[in-house]
Amino acid sequence: MRKIIVTVAPVCHVGKEIPEECKNPLTPEEITEDVVNCYKAGACQVHLHTRDLKGNPTFELDVFQKTINMIREKTDM
């Protein structure tokens, strides 16, 4: 049997504007919930971007670290 790797990218990184039809989690809690659901469905890797509460991309370490910690508490990703 051939093995595959399933990667999930829960946060759309298309600039400042998020398309209306796109479900895009913003908070670490929302991102974690999506990642955990994908993990349960077979995903084994996450490609992560974070956003602030206004929907803008953010590279703030505390937001990223909180999100990573929450994901690691609930998965082995």
Predicted regions located by residue number:
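Histidine-centered catalytic micro-motifs
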Residues: 8, 45-54
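Alpha-helix N-cap and loop-to-helix initiation/capping positions
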Residues: 22-30, 55-66
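Alpha-helix-loop-beta-strand connector modules within alpha/beta enzyme cores
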Residues: 2, 57-77
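Glycine-rich, aromatic-flanked loop segments that form ligand/cofactor-binding clefts
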Residues: 1-11
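A structural motif
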Residues: 40-43
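Glycine-rich loops and low-complexity Gly/Arg-rich segments
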Residues: 30-34, 70-73
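Active-site mouth loops of central-metabolism enzymes
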Residues: 9-33
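Conserved, mostly hydrophobic/aromatic
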Residues: 31, 38, 49
